[in-house]
């Protein structure tokens, strides 16, 4: 067509040439508009197909039967035995995954993407913790045990296969608050080059039936995906207390969550790249089922630091600070009998604030002694409040 316009343009007057140019531009504009309308038509056709297609039924795979059929639990209620559509890769069909059934509920038409619970997503996940054993004072024996039962199986599982024994599946750390249980777990994750997943057990306690158990299940699935990994369950007594026969619906839900945790502990290989560490300061109320062989096999006490331990902890914190030369670590350790590692850290921080308030850039021995007295007053108040609560509870 453009050739015809060229012939007309050569044999025509200037006005006619201008008209031809306008017509050419109009044709180009119309061609673009036709293409846009074609795209819009295809879009609406696709939308109409979606609207007219029958809805699918969501279901969860329970088991794959020997004859190739699948047992599923449908969202509408009953368990069904269904077939797999020919276009579905049968290797993708595994227990626990979500699938879409046709409206009659007889065939799996689609494998749905796996969803991760928002609570699991928000758990503290540290790809590579930066805590080392050298930052922990007074816990040499506890570090040795953790290295043997957590770090060694993660780094050298073949040693256990050769000798024919299985390492412990889980480790339980117990002791007063602030004694370094979380730091121990982070340090062993650092040395093992493992992802550290920190969860407080109370996060498992949900108000809807089955929610807590599902979160536990998804937590272990995430840990397997991120392996090598260490799951650290803090305050496990929140869901692991001794079970009672009669309780509220909330207590029954916590018991279901505990049962799911026990099932997960029973269900994984101790030589896998996932290790479980739990911590509590109330080991006396834990359910015996948690402590039986095959679950939390190794129980490690993390006590308040002794004189030597307190000296080491003071040295760890003070060597990072600007201090005067006359600091007497032994005297500081004597003055802090009964202090936890967290208390000693608070002493060092409080002493630094005293120096800052006075406009000094170094911490003195007097600052540290005053800080010890201040922390002692706070500790005594907390103890007094605790005693009153126990008296009137």
From Swiss-Prot:
Docks into pockets in the proteasome alpha-ring to cause gate opening: region residues: 391-393
Recorded GO CC terms: cytoplasm; proteasome regulatory particle, base subcomplex; proteasome-activating nucleotidase complex
Annotated ATP binding sites: 178-183, 317
GO molecular function: ATP binding; ATP hydrolysis activity; proteasome-activating activity
Coiled coil: 15-53, 365-393
A single BP term in Gene Ontology: protein unfolding
Entries under InterPro entries matching the protein: 26S_Proteasome_ATPase (IPR050221), AAA+_ATPase (IPR003593), AAA_lid_3 (IPR041569), ATPase_AAA_core (IPR003959), ATPase_AAA_CS (IPR003960), NA-bd_OB-fold (IPR012340), Nucleotidase_PAN (IPR023501), P-loop_NTPase (IPR027417)
Pfam family, one: Prot_ATP_ID_OB_C
Family: Belongs to the AAA ATPase family.
UniProt xrefs under HAMAP family: PAN
Its biological purpose: ATPase which is responsible for recognizing, binding, unfolding and translocation of substrate proteins into the archaeal 20S proteasome core particle. Is essential for opening the gate of the 20S proteasome via an interaction with its C-terminus, thereby allowing substrate entry and access to the site of proteolysis. Thus, the C-termini of the proteasomal ATPase function like a 'key in a lock' to induce gate opening and therefore regulate proteolysis.
Protein name (record): Proteasome-activating nucleotidase
Gene assigned in the entry: pan
């Amino acid at each position: 067509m453009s050739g015809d316009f060229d012939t007309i343009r050569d044999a025509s007057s200037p006005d006619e040439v201008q008209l031809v140019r306008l017509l050419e531009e109009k044709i180009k504009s119309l061609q673009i508009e036709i293409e846009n309308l074609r795209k819009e038509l295809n879009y609406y056709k696709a939308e109409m197909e979606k609207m007219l297609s029958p809805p699918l039924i969501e279901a969860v795979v329970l088991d794959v039967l020997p004859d190739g059929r699948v047992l599923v639990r449908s969202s509408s209620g009953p368990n069904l035995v269904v077939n797999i559509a020919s276009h579905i890769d049968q290797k993708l069909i595994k227990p626990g995954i979500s699938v879409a059934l046709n409206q009659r509920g007889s065939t799996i038409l689609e494998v749905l993407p796996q969803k991760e619970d928002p609570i699991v997503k928000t758990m503290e996940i540290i790809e590579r913790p930066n805590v080392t054993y050298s930052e922990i004072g007074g816990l040499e024996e506890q570090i040795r045990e953790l290295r043997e039962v957590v770090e060694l199986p993660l780094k050298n599982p073949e040693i256990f296969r050769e000798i024919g024994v299985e390492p412990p599946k889980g480790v339980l750390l117990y002791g007063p608050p602030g004694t370094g249980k979380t730091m121990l777990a982070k340090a062993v994750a650092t040395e093992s080059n493992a992802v550290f997943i920190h969860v407080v057990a109370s996060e498992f306690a949900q108000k809807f039936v089955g929610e807590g158990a599902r979160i536990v299940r998804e937590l272990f699935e995430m840990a397997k995906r991120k392996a090598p990994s260490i799951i650290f369950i803090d305050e496990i007594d929140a869901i692991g207390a001794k079970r009672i026969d009669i309780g509220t619906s909330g207590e029954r839900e916590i018991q279901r969550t505990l049962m799911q945790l026990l099932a997960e502990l029973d269900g994984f290989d101790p030589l896998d790249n996932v290790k479980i560490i739990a911590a509590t300061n109330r080991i006396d109320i834990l359910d015996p089922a948690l402590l039986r062989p095959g679950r939390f096999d190794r129980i490690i006490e993390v006590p308040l630091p002794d004189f030597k331990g307190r000296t080491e902890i003071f040295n760890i914190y003070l060597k990072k600070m600007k201090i005067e030369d006359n600091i007497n670590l032994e005297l500081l350790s004597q003055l802090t009998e009964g202090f936890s590692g967290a208390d000693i850290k608070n002493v060092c921080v409080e002493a630094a604030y005293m120096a800052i308030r006075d406009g000094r850039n170094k911490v003195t021995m007097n600052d540290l002694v005053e800080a010890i007295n201040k922390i002692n007053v706070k500790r005594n108040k907390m103890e007094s409040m605790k005693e009153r609560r126990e008296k009137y509870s």
